[in-house]
């Protein structure tokens, strides 16, 4: 049974043919309706945020459906319009409203000889908001007002494009057309208690609570309802949950991507009025641990020397050496957690465990070095405490020091950062049998290429080679304000290539350690190739200075390229035996 859901009402075929015709007319003849800002990934996994295109006069969309005759018939005319209007401030794309598989959409685009991005609406919430209901239809979207300003057949699009290019309003914003219907799966009865609150509790409330790192709490229906317009916006633009990666590449325990069903539930509930059902409020009854430590009271707490941070100015990186006070014997480390004293000024740290009689090395600060040595987690925005895999750990020798490189930013208010690091050990009689290894695919000043001024998509590449059979565990990207995206790919000895992770919308504020759900076996000689793009354009709202040629540098207005990879060697005997010597 076909159903159509729009706003707070639903029409069914069973309700009468006349009502259905009326409803379809309402949808088809609406334009200049505010959709809102949004972002989607295309058939190649690239991220497109509509707000980024606000220097354009409009964005043109052609509704693409695999195997649709209407799409195929419209492509040639659409491409001809692109060749004419692309230089006049019109961006051309397609949109797949059915959320069809990326591989099939990519193949369909190749078959049609399409060279424009095809945005894939997995959850169908964007297409629904735009009012898309027919394949092969053309739309014009204003990236400043976030409105649909034209919809109709491609044959009628030319007139609208001429008007928009000339700075005029579209005289005929809606032109009726026929075509294959686009249908949507709708949840007609969404419960706050049973459907919405559990999603928020699982994905949002840990940060959005009293004392959490988020700026407001989502601890009741009233709070959620009050913030619901903002929640809809950040879901549609993929700003939240933070740190999202491409869900179509790899399988990660912390990809921070809501499922299609979860997105549909939240946005559908908000668009239905954010109503509450039942007497209870699950969010109001959530409880949180009384301790700030993730795994109970640590076995050892390292006090980082307090740092006085002025209100303004540029601060050099601060390097300190901190003893593991109270460590009276060698211990195997199971977990660690860095708690910032003032997270408004501490941006990140680099850590290195320095054993007695040794000197710190660059590799040890960059996640490499001796795999037998203990790993003490650094502070990274949004990062979780580090817990080793079962039966895995490194040795922290008595008398060791912790080298810390601290990066602070000023906020206009003087403050003191007094951070703490919690460390948890294995029992003395339990020696973990496996070690974690790692290496950074990094670009340093000697091989860095300066980013040209105003370049919106400047790419650089670095690689590392894993010399023995190994199981990949996790990946960490690091760039600065101009970082746009970063991709890790495995180039195998047999010549095949596999994408491992796609951080499609890199955000300097969220640099996470993305953990594979299952370790991935790669053979000896596998090359991990990391490709990163930088956006040095004026459209990058975080860009300090688009006119500048950007060098490598430690400060945020310069740039870096770190692609950290962690793995375990399949043969652990050499590593373990070297520890025993």
Question: Can you name each region flagged by the protein language model?
Answer:
Residues 14-26:
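Bacterial N-terminal signal peptides
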Residues 242, 247-252, 282-332, 337-471, ...:
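Beta-strand-centric surfaces of beta-sandwich/beta-rich domains
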Residues 36, 58, 114-117, 132-139, ...:
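Structural micro-motif
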Residues 121-183:
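Thiol/selenol-based redox catalytic cores and closely related redox-interacting motifs
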Residues 174-327, 331, 339, 348, ...:
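Aromatic- and Gly/Pro-enriched helix-to-coil junctions and flexible linker segments
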Residues 70-112, 119-129:
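Structural microenvironment flanking redox-active thiols in thiol-disulfide oxidoreductases
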Residues 53-72:
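Short active-site neighborhood of thiol/selenol oxidoreductases, capturing the structured segment around
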């Amino acid at each position: 049974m076909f159903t159509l859901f729009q706003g707070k009402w639903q029409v069914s075929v069973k309700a009468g043919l006349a009502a259905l015709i009326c409803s379809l007319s309402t949808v088809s003849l609406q334009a200049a309706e505010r959709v809102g800002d949004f972002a989607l990934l295309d058939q190649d996994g690239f991220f497109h945020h509509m707000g980024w295109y606000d220097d354009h006069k409009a964005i043109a969309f052609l509704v693409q459906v695999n195997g649709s005759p209407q799409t195929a018939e419209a492509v040639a005319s659409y491409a001809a319009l692109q060749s004419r209007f692309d230089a006049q401030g019109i961006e051309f794309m397609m949109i797949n409203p059915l959320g069809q598989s990326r591989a099939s959409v990519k193949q369909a685009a190749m078959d049609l000889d399409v060279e424009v991005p095809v945005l894939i609406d997995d959850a169908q919430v964007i297409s629904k908001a735009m009012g898309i209901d027919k394949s092969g239809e053309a739309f014009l979207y204003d990236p400043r007002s976030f409105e649909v300003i034209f919809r109709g057949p491609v044959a009628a699009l030319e007139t609208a494009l001429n008007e928009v290019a000339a700075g005029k309003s579209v005289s005929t914003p809606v032109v009726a057309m026929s075509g294959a219907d686009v249908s949507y799966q709708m949840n007609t009865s969404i419960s706050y208690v049973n459907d919405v609150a559990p999603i928020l509790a699982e994905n949002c409330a840990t940060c959005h609570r009293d004392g959490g790192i988020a700026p407001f709490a989502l601890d009741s229906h009233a709070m959620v309802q009050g913030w619901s317009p903002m929640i809809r916006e950040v879901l549609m633009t993929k700003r939240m949950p933070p740190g999202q990666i491409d869900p179509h590449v790899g399988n990660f325990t912390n990809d921070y991507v809501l499922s299609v069903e979860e997105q549909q539930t939240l946005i559908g509930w908000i668009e239905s009025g954010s109503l509450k059902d039942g007497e209870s409020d699950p969010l109001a009854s959530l409880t949180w641990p009384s301790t700030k430590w993730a795994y109970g009271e640590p076995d050892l707490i390292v006090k980082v020397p307090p740092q006085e941070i002025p209100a303004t100015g540029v601060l050099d990186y601060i390097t300190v050496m901190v003893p593991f006070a109270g460590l009276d014997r060698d211990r195997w480390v199971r977990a660690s957690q860095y708690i910032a004293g003032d997270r408004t000024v501490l941006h990140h740290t680099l850590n290195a465990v320095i054993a007695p009689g040794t000197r710190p090395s660059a590799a040890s600060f960059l996640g490499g070095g001796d795999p037998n040595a203990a790993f003490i987690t650094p502070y990274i925005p949004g990062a979780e405490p580090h817990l080793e895999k079962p039966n895995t750990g490194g040795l922290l020798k008595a008398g060791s020091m912790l080298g810390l490189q601290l990066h602070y930013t000023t906020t206009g208010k003087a403050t003191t950062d007094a951070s703490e690091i919690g460390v948890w050990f294995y029992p003395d009689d339990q020696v973990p049998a496996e070690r974690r290894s790692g290496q950074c695919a990094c670009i340093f000043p000697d091989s860095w290429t300066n980013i040209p001024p105003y370049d919106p998509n400047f790419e650089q590449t670095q690689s590392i080679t894993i010399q023995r059979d190994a199981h990949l565990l996790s990946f960490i990207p690091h760039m600065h304000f101009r970082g746009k995206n970063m991709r890790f790919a495995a180039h195998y000895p047999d010549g095949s290539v596999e994408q491992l992770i796609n951080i499609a919308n890199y955000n300097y504020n969220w640099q996470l350690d993305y953990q594979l759900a299952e370790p991935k076996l790669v053979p000896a000689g596998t090359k991990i190739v990391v490709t990163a793009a930088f956006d040095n354009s004026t459209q990058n709202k975080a860009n300090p200075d688009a006119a500048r040629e950007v060098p490598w540098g430690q400060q945020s207005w310069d740039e870096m390229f770190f692609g950290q990879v962690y793995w375990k060697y399949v043969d652990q005997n050499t590593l373990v035996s070297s520890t025993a010597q």
